[in-house]
Amino acid sequence: WLQRKKCGAVGGGRYGAGMKFGAVITYATEREFTELALVAEDAGWDQVFTWEAVWGQDAWVTLGAAAMATERIRLGTLLTPAARHRPWDLASRVASLDRLSGGRVTLGVGLGALHGNWLAFEADEGRAVRARKLDEVLDVYAGLMGGQPFSYTGEHFSASPVTELVPPPPVQTPHPPVWCVGLMVPSRSRQRSLERAARWQGVFPAIAGGSLENPGSQLTPPALRELVERLGALRAEAGQTMQGYDVVVEGDSHGEFGTVHPPVEQWADAGATWWVESWWDLPDSPEGRAELRRRLELGPPRT
């Protein structure tokens, strides 16, 4: 039902193999997302993302459709409010998509941004509870991906070994990578959000704007460099390096979304390994969709 149209891949670029480029497809039906993922793949993007709603279009069905139509481009969520999930459900969805795509999935997680479309369906348990749930969900996610027998006992979730209908493992080992929001609070000696991000495979960096309750991002290249240094120290304490670890900066080289802007090379020099275009300034309209497609066809801002 889709006809592939070659757009001409953008090659090379001065940032080399270390810097990769993604885009959030902001407003699109499942079919439109799949078509735009094809456009992005042909134009040289490295990954496309969808957002995950509390109620609405299912992110994993959407990514599954894109997985069947594409061959190379990675597929991810930005973001999955993982604390809302039962961890075995999340592990099932991500592993299924990883097998379907041939190992092209990234799970992006955070505590979730509270808004009317969330609170219309469930009360907020509080940031501290969501944080503890997020940690447990990720622990169980990783454990189940490793196969059976697996057992876990936590404050909110538990799991016992099973022997029947055990699914095959994901393609990516030990599991599809997890990228976590990592919020650095300059006034705090302990950085719990960064500690979480350091335990996994990548970080969406953010700088708190005064308090945890108002974490408006104040990310700058110098702040990113400090955050990456802190992550490096945390990983070193656990016997890990930054080799293969992803630092993902969101920005908008076309419009006005957020406070993070190019030049992209400054972010690469500060430690970023991914630049992700987030075009939330575009309207949810035929004109907005046409502009999103045009931006994807231009390819990533490699030069």
Locate each region found by the language model.
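Active-site-adjacent structural elements that line small-molecule/cofactor binding pockets in enzymes
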Residues: 8-303
